Each structure stands twice: as structure tokens, then as C-alpha cells.
A protein has these predicted regions:
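Nucleotide/phosphate-binding catalytic cleft detector across ATP-hydrolyzing
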Residues: 1-157, 165-282, 289-346
Length: 346
């Protein structure tokens, strides 16, 4: 067992939290969900166990996601969630100090939102906290050489936000963050199934539909799955069959929003860097980058080769882990980079 404090890299996502422990790799991979007894304030479950309680809890128990669109929406619950996950990450160490932590944040977050993340991590047990932009962490985790003058583009499509960035010489040249990502696709499925089929489904079921038959580019074969929900009129259980071609139509609008944003960032980028990107290609990371046809859609839209990184779910966490080597020469707070921020409200 180690006798010193662990340095941790944290992908604090809207849908999932991944924690990288120096020398060990990713040691925590849990949904960003907390279940709490409202009467006592006691945390009952965190992570996968809490996620399984969504929509199934008695009146005194609430299962919730304390982050929304990439930022903290419930400070107290975020602190309690991080306390449990930090404890899980360092349980194999006889640490004498609290850990130093690098946490990713979406591009273009405000100083207030940055401070909220830092405060939550400190209250959860971190000794020092450093922030890194998600696309920079994603690029590091995907193995891109961003130290050279040659430009690279990363599109990180997570649960709460899509972050698009052009990187060069260890910095972010142009970046954008929009709240159109995995959760928006899930919500679109929920609305469609209720409106068209008169069946009410929950977020867990919607995510299963997205993963199994969801697509943002036409499939050569129309695949299907059987879904069980509650009839909106009778309240009774009801099964229905959904097809990928149907979900493709549901996904058209949010997919277009993401493609529009990628194109917009390219238009804000210098011609020299755009030339580099055309040569190097666009790298996709994040869980929702694995939506069937996302790479094809963006390639058709931009005319640039697009590829999904290896283990795209973990790229940001691994990037935070690589950035741990920087913190001995840094001051606490955001990792300062020369960058041009673009924030859009979609």
C-alpha cells in the first residue's frame, strides 16, 4: 500500500464520474447519481446503485443527478457524491494527506461555475484543486500530440455538454460548449414515445434505446427493439416495438445542432489551423460520440475525416491523469491557457 497521498484526475460529467489515480489508471467509473433519504438527509447510494433507483424510489427517497449541462446544479449533493467517490478511489492507500485533484470543466464556464467546482472538491476532501478544460483533457487522453504548432480538433460529446475545440501548442485556440449532448437525445426519445405512442418511459429506458438502436446517420438495415413503459391513458404496463429509422428522425435536430457547432468553430479558426485539421482529421470523444453514424455525419458536413478515439468514454479521465504531471509547477485553480472562448446558448 502507498503511504503518500494520491493525486486524482476527475472527469466530473453530467452522466458519469470517472476518477484516475496516479499509477493505477481509472479506478472509479460511476453514474453521476445520488440517492438520499429526504427525511434524514442520509445518503443511501451513490453511482450505479443510485442510478438503478431512478424512478423506483419510495416517497421519502429521492434519486437525483446533481450536475446539469456540465455544471453543478446541486452543490450539497455534488459534495456528498464526491466524498463517496474520493473515498472509493483512495481506499487502497494509507494516505497521510488529502489528495490533490485535477477536475475537468466545460469550455467557457464562468468564474462562478469554476469556483463552485473547486469549493465542492475541497469540501469533499481535496487538498488542492486544479481545473482543466474538457477538450484539452480529451485530446491528451486520446493520445493527440497537441504540443506541436500543428492544429487538432476535438469534439467531446458527453451527457450534458458537447465541447468543440481547436488545439495547438498545448493550448486551446478556439473553443465552444453547447448544452446539446446525450441527455438531449434521451429527452427527445422520451417526448417522442409519449407523443406518438402514448407510452411513458423513464430516462434509463431512453438511454438504452439510444445505445441499442439510436443513430444520427441512416443505417443500411432497420433494426428494432421491444420497449416496456406505462400507457399514458390506462396507467397499465405496455410493450411497443421501436425501429432505428424512427429514432433517426427523432435525432435529426440535436444531431444538426452539434454539426452546426462544429462547422461554426471551424469558421472561427484561422486558415492555417483549418489546413492542419484537414490533414490531421477530427477526433471524437465522449460517450455520445459512439452514437451510430456520428463520425459519418460530421465527416459529410465538414468534408474532413472524422474518427472516434479508442475508449472514448475514458479519454477525459485519462487526460486528467496525464495532466497530473503538471501540478507540481502550478498554482491552485484553473489551468491557464491562451484561448479564445466561444459560448453559445442553444
Amino acid at each position: 500500500m502507498q503511504l503518500f497521498s494520491n493525486d486524482l484526475g476527475v472527469d466530473l460529467g453530467t452522466s458519469n464520474v470517472l476518477i484516475y489515480s496516479e499509477g493505477k489508471g481509472v479506478v472509479v467509473r460511476e453514474p453521476s447519481v445520488v440517492a438520499m433519504d429526504k427525511n434524514t438527509g442520509r445518503i443511501m447510494q451513490v453511482g450505479a446503485a443510485a442510478r438503478n433507483m431512478l424512478g423506483r424510489t419510495p416517497g421519502n427517497v429521492v434519486a437525483m443527478r446533481p450536475l446539469k449541462e456540465g455544471v453543478i446544479s446541486d452543490h450539497e449533493m455534488t459534495v456528498k457524491m464526491l466524498q463517496e467517490l474520493f473515498r472509493s478511489a483512495i481506499k487502497s492507500s494509507l494516505f497521510t494527506h488529502k489528495p490533490r485533484v485535477i477536475i475537468c470543466v466545460p469550455s467557457g464556464v464562468t468564474e462562478v461555475e469554476e469556483r463552485s467546482v473547486i469549493n465542492a472538491a475541497v469540501e469533499a476532501g481535496a487538498r488542492r484543486v486544479y481545473l482543466i478544460e474538457e477538450p484539452l483533457a480529451a485530446a491528451l487522453g486520446a493520445g493527440l500530440d497537441i504540443s506541436s504548432p500543428s492544429g487538432h480538433m476535438v469534439v467531446d460529446i458527453g451527457g450534458g455538454t458537447t465541447n468543440v475545440a481547436v488545439l495547438s501548442m498545448n493550448g486551446v485556440a478556439v473553443s465552444s460548449s453547447i448544452p446539446t449532448a446525450g441527455d438531449v437525445f434521451d429527452d427527445a426519445i422520451i417526448r417522442h414515445v409519449r407523443r406518438k405512442h402514448g407510452v411513458v418511459i423513464g430516462q434509463v429506458t431512453a438511454e438504452e434505446i439510444k445505445i441499442q438502436i439510436g443513430c444520427v446517420y441512416p443505417r443500411s438495415e432497420d433494426i428494432s427493439m421491444i420497449v416496456r413503459g406505462r400507457d399514458s391513458k390506462t396507467g397499465m404496463p405496455r410493450d411497443l416495438t421501436l425501429y432505428s429509422s424512427e429514432i433517426f428522425e427523432v435525432f435529426r435536430r440535436p444531431a444538426k445542432v452539434i454539426a452546426d457547432e462544429v462547422q461554426s468553430v471551424l469558421e472561427e479558426t484561422s486558415p492555417e489551423l483549418v489546413g492542419d485539421i484537414a490533414e490531421n482529421g477530427i477526433t471524437l470523444t465522449g460517450g455520445c460520440s459512439q452514437l451510430w453514424g456520428m463520425d459519418q455525419l460530421l465527416m459529410e458536413r465538414t468534408g474532413i475525416q472524422c474518427s472516434v478515439a479508442d475508449d472514448p468514454d475514458s479519454c477525459v479521465a485519462y487526460g486528467c491523469g496525464k495532466a497530473l504531471s503538471w501540478i507540481n509547477t502550478m498554482t491552485e485553480g484553473p489551468i491557464n491557457l491562451a484561448r479564445k472562448r466561444i459560448m453559445r446558448s442553444i
